[in-house]
Amino acid sequence: MEIITDIASLRVRLQDEASIALVPTMGNLHAGHLSLVRIAQQHAACTVVSIFVNRLQFAPHEDYDRYPRTQENDCRLLEEYGVDIVFIPGEKTLFPIPQEFQLLLPPVADTLEGACRPGFFRGVTTVVLKLFNIVQPQVAIFGEKDYQQLQIICRMVAQLNLPVEIIAGQTIRAEDGLALSSRNNYLDNIQRQKASELACNLKKIGESIASGERNFPQLEWSAIERLNMHGWKVDYISVRQNRTLLPATACDSGLVILGAAWLDQIRLIDNFPLVLS
């Protein structure tokens, strides 16, 4: 496995590769990330994992400075998994001058996560587009855990005619249903025991819909009330069309239930995809 930190060296290393798969990450890797690595290895001759904590997607009051950075352990795990290249650019590598150009995003980027974290998706898409230009992969792997992000990146690729196929990896969960996330490291033992309640409530909505319930606002409100009663502060719970991310209607068959909520000072997000027959 090679660890590369500069763009020129990476391009030289990749120039003769028949096919390249990219797995963009912010590090602090867990089984969810590693499942994406396995998918990448099935789709290309060379697997590149990038590690970059993207300052652009953090608001000033958010956790950029304390976001877990575990580069040594990350590289050990990736070597065990047979990754070919780990690309770890510094901030000056990706942003040698102030970033003046950014994408104009569609309205969906201002809803849900975008409404709670203004500028988040602009920061995400800027760095993802940079990575696509640098690595020039044929395939890139993103997790369904960040469902709205996945859909926005798919739109970016389609509408900008980028020559890369986006493949989604399923959310990996702990035994109690909690979606694996780097921010789970913030949870203490008591919080960890409660953390799966968000996933359980999203799943409960999905089960109600699968059983024939179509009063989506009532299902959303009931889940929010249950979480609030258990000490959570909910940003949103919303039933959406799974591709457009517009509010779902009773006629839709492809759905996703998305949620974000605070457990004390820790913000968790999750989703529950649902396809009705």
From Swiss-Prot:
Pathway in which the depicted protein is active: Cofactor biosynthesis; (R)-pantothenate biosynthesis; (R)-pantothenate from (R)-pantoate and beta-alanine: step 1/1
Catalysed reactions, as listed in the record: (R)-pantoate + beta-alanine + ATP = (R)-pantothenate + AMP + diphosphate + H(+)
Enzyme class, broadest EC rank: ligase
Single biological process term from Gene Ontology: pantothenate biosynthetic process
InterPro entries: Pantoate_ligase (IPR003721), Pantoate_ligase_C (IPR042176), Rossmann-like_a/b/a_fold (IPR014729)
Quaternary structure and partners: Homodimer.
The name this protein goes by in its record: Pantothenate synthetase
